[in-house]
Amino acid sequence: MKVHKRKKFGCLPTLLIIVFLIFILNFLKTRYNEVSYYTDSPIDGISEIFNFGLGFDPDEYKTDDKRILKNNLKKEANSGNDKASWIVDNFDNLDDALIYLAGNDPDTIAFVYNYQNGITNFEFFPGESVLLDRKTPYFLQWDNRWAYNALDDKNIGFYGCGPTAMAMVLARLNGDISITPDIVSKDAESYMTYGGISWDFFSDEAKRYGYTISEIPLDEYELIYALDQGPLIVSVNGGYFTLFGHIMVIDSYKDGKFVINDPNSIRKSQKSWSYDEISNQIAKIWLIK
């Protein structure tokens, strides 16, 4: 009787095909997540990030301690955030600005991952970045619709807190949410400096849209009174909201606390803040009406 010898490595091609198919499926899944991150709706897209962020506390000051930042990112990675895992794996090769951003706020991890991997082509659609149910529309500077648009020597996602804050205010005053950060950033280009954005931009942009701007003294009751007249643009120093300098909007005063639209953080925008918590970080306040 003729005996058929089993061919050596007969199952190897099948295993290779299975491995290849798994790789392709994971790749397509990643690309789908990236492309659809903001395309279904602002809420559905951004709400995904709230599955993560378990190791971050919005009440903590921002830090430049890389040991703490890496530990924060590891917690994110361990919770199942693949983009955080990638940042941890490439931690030592990333610019400090990227590490400070992603390590201090999990909301920004997807932006950092996309930026570093050249995933910057996203569909534009109208509407706020997140619906927070307040007087001032909410825009994020790192919203994929405009985050990668050039501003100064980087982009809106990095340096666009000023024009994003101004876009929120103008959208509210005009009742027109089509006034988005990408539009206002074009006006801001010539005001960008090494330290951020010139404060002259806010007065000039307010006048460009037909509004007046006035400086408000740092006093709790002055802030409350001013908010009855319109939204406030606030420049802050290092603390809860930034390491170095930042621009954001105070939307209103409710139940003894200030409601803030932070263009760089959803979590810090969802928390209300007492005067004592933020007053020592405020550098300048403007009322636009």
Enumerate the predicted regions with their spans.
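Juxtamembrane low-complexity tails/linkers enriched in Ser/Thr-Pro and polybasic
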Residues: M1-K5
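Active-site-adjacent structural segments surrounding the nucleophilic cysteine of cysteine proteases
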Residues: K7-L15, L21-D187
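Extracytoplasmic/periplasmic, Sec-exported soluble proteins
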Residues: D153-G162, D176, Y194-S198, E215, ...
